[in-house]
Amino acid sequence: MTHRDDLFSAPIASLGDWTFDERVAEVFPDMIQRSVPGYSNIISMIGMLAGRFARPGTQIYDLGCALGAATLAMRRTISHGDCRIIAVDNSPAMIDRCRRHISAFHATTPTEIIEDDISTVPIENASLVVLNFTMQFLEPAQRQTLLNRIYAGLNTGGALVLSEKFSFQDQLIGGLLFDMHHDFKRANGYSELEISQKRSMLENVMLTDTVEVHKQRLVEAGFGHAELWFQCFNFGSLISIKPESGQ
């Protein structure tokens, strides 16, 4: 059962910083659908990408898996029985619900769900790694190191999907897309109070980068091919491929 997100519908005296606690986990499916434009498209396309990039005998990582939406989408399209998905999140509330959610659906692809820090979890023999709206919650100083580790753990020909909320160098365009995102949330039933309170809680926790900064980091990590494949307002997703020799 999906619970409606009304966490911020009444004034909160002391907001504090955002955490992925039990209250957020309970309403997360509704929250993200109503807050992130294009989220359903990205999830379904991640499933399609898994069908293309998964290789027998390899591992697929869903880093910052939340309740497992991307993991489920990938399991539906992977045809190799000996390909394993490893889903990782550091929130106990998210991981608990993710385990219950994943176990409710039968699939032939083995799936391991781990409560751990994505900055330190080993990445090995990977054909696909997914960071779906996760990097933006890491300290900026940790981001390049994580990408370097992902690149090292990917097999040649493997891919990284990196979905994020973006900031923009062009202030006019950035302001327009920011306003359009708020229009999107209003259209999905969020009040001005809800939008304002959630933004206040996120502003010290979710630190966004421009597409250009993301691409620069990916190139520095070693990815020979990196491009934006999806964008809706100030949300989007990049795909990066670890090149075969000579590519």
From Swiss-Prot:
PANTHER family: CARBOXY-S-ADENOSYL-L-METHIONINE SYNTHASE, TRANS-ACONITATE 2-METHYLTRANSFERASE-RELATED. HAMAP family: Cx_SAM_synthase (MF_01589). Homodimer. GO terms for molecular function: carboxyl- or carbamoyltransferase activity; S-adenosyl-L-methionine binding. Its EC number is 2.1.3.-. It catalyses: prephenate + S-adenosyl-L-methionine = carboxy-S-adenosyl-L-methionine + 3-phenylpyruvate + H2O. This is Carboxy-S-adenosyl-L-methionine synthase. The keyword Cell inner membrane does not apply. It comes from Sodalis glossinidius (strain morsitans). InterPro entries: CmoA (IPR005271), Methyltransf_25 (IPR041698), SAM-dependent_MTases_sf (IPR029063).
